[in-house]
Amino acid sequence: MDINEKAPGPSGRRPARRRDGGGQVLVLYLAIAVVVAVLAWPWLAPRLGSFPGSLLSWIGDGGSVGAPRPATLDERMDMVEAALAPLAMRIAEADRRLAMLEANPRTAGEDPRKEAAGVSADPEQMSWMAAEIATLKGDLEIVRKLAADEGGATKLSGAVEKAEAAFRRIAERRDRAPLFLAALGQLREAVDRGSPYPAQMKAAMILAEKGTADKLAPLVMGSATGIVTRVGLAESFRVTAAAARKLDVPADSGWVPPNIRRWLGGAVLIRRTEGGEEGLDGILNSTSRLLAGGDLAGAAALLRRAEGPSLAAIQPWLEAAELRLSADAALSELSAMAMTVASSRDE
């Protein structure tokens, strides 16, 4: 036995042939080529106009990912023109047939032998022809009116754009309503606490609509310093009432101190037929009772009847009360409007 020959294995089988990695590399190249083709399809599609439409549509459907994009304005105009193509063909046919009908009488007049032969047209066919001509004339008149307007396509495009803008505004308004309602909630919390609210006010102004931003004007005045709460107004009214009574003391009141004079006046009970108290003391006492019951609007309305020197002490408190009432009314109205818009999102 030659020394170069290899001895067979103990089982008598040949050793297995070694496989190279050529097949795996080929599969990898094919996968990379497919991925590159899919990614480059948007760039290649306009440059492959000579390919058949079915092949391009099959490739486009296979390479597109996600939902189809909405048609643009140019595409919609192309669809409108395609829909008007049959009408244009009918108009051309109508013009041809009208020309033939106009030529027939002239031909008949030029050839009197046909009239002598007694050739007459079918009445049913003539009536059908007249109805068809009337229909075609109506269609032709409509198209001619549209064609006479040089800016018809521009007007149509502008109308479509206006409609799309209106739909976008409605959708944006519905989407911003919950955010505006949340901003109003934070603004109301700050106003109820009596603390400054510049950040909350800025957020509300950004999210508010054009017509709604004007309703936030009562809240702008107190954004830097805050608005006095209802409890604070009720507590500060005691000081205001005392200052108003001091200013209301007449010059010829004599030597009797004001507190003793008020005590003497309260010791005498006078039943009045109208059921109301008179003078500054009556107004201040009624205002105190209304504030104790939580009726700030009624207290402010009653206090506006005060006159005389005491008005200088009452006016600052009255302005603070009116600002509080205006702020509460504006927040309530804006919250109701925002909730109405937000509730219509699913309609």
Curated annotation (Swiss-Prot):
Induction (record text): Part of the probable mms6 operon.
Localization, UniProt: Magnetosome membrane
Protein known as: Probable magnetosome protein Mms36
Transmembrane found in the keyword field: yes
Transmembrane region(s): 25-45
Additional remarks: This bacteria makes up to 60 cubo-octahedral magnetosomes of about 45 nm in diameter which contain membrane-bound crystals of magnetite (Fe(3)O(4)).
Membrane topology annotation: Single-pass membrane protein
Gene: mms36
